[in-house]
Amino acid sequence: MIRVYTQRQQGKNWLQRYQGYKPIFGCILGFTDTGLIPGISAAGATPQDRQYTCLADIEFLYNGLQLQPQYPLPPLEAGASPVLITKAIIDTLNIPLYLFNAGLYHKPTVPTIDLGGAPARCLTSGHALDLATIQHLLEVGSYWGRKLADEAKDSYVILGECVVGGTTTALAVLLGLGIGAIGKVNSSHPQCNHDQKLAVVHQGLQEAGFHSALPVSEPLKLVAAVGDPMQIVVAGMGMAASLKVGVMLAGGTQMLAVYALMQVLAEKLSLLWRPENIVVGTTRWVAEDPTGDTVGLAQEIGCVPLMATQLHFDESCYPQLQAYERGYVKEGVGCGGCAITAHLYRNWNQTQLLKAVEDLFASFIFLE
């Protein structure tokens, strides 16, 4: 149920080390106006819908099924929110949940830990966030990384994200770091919109005065210019937690960008971390997306173990879940990492994973 795609021995060692352990799950929430560009993301059918995707996802993640949610899960072109996968797993396995608000326009309807960040402007501005905000988020992320490590004790921490438009800010950071990511990233679209993403990213890097062919020497300025608030929080959190416990960065393109950022923070700012304790965990739909090259991207970054759950919805009786097999949605809210955990912690197989998700989805569509 788990396949390791890169740095196989390190990835297998990590899996063996944490087999049978119950982790804790932290989901880092953020917003970027980049996600409102028409057509940039399918995480919400319209830009108006995408303003509230994160709020709806975390309300569902925390409260579960409700007759009248304040923020209902948004309509999608096809598929169903990945939060359904995450929720089914963390509830069934009783995995502790921490929600971190790194920067949202609207106050969440459920309890979150406010990190004192801010939502990001569109990356085309070349000034997505103030440098002081990035510096603060790195510090507070590191603080909470240490706290989560203490809570996890001998186990590991899953760090997921909820940022609409986040694969585009990820591409911007990757190119700014000098990583050959063109044509390799993923999106929530069935066919990745590489040309649109690249045009947006080039505009932002040019506005900020960064040359995408040269690795940046000041990573915090890069994230402030073209990034989003989640990235720097997870980087600080993951690096700090890795000094004591295992860390799974639960996501695809976005978490590979965070890992690349960690490497540069360690090199340029001498931040301490233990990279042997960190893996990136995602879904098969991301790792094997024929319209991107996730494995190639991980190899470009270097030294990062990339693994994915082999969960599939081929045999699902719900067309919304079957849509994942046609390339829709793919990942989000840490669903891939949580599916990996279901097998690692309780040895769940395909049948058990599918049943947990379908049981929740059946109740969800009954209430709709």
Swiss-Prot record:
GO terms for molecular function: nicotinate-nucleotide-dimethylbenzimidazole phosphoribosyltransferase activity. CDD domains: DMB-PRT_CobT. InterPro entries: Nict_dMeBzImd_PRibTrfase, Nict_dMeBzImd_PRibTrfase_arc, Nict_dMeBzImd_PRibTrfase_sf. SUPFAM superfamilies: Nicotinate mononucleotide:5,6-dimethylbenzimidazole phosphoribosyltransferase (CobT) (SSF52733). Belongs to the UPF0284 family. NCBIfam families: nicotinate mononucleotide-dependent phosphoribosyltransferase CobT, PRK04447.1-6. This is UPF0284 protein Tery_1555. It comes from Trichodesmium erythraeum (strain IMS101).
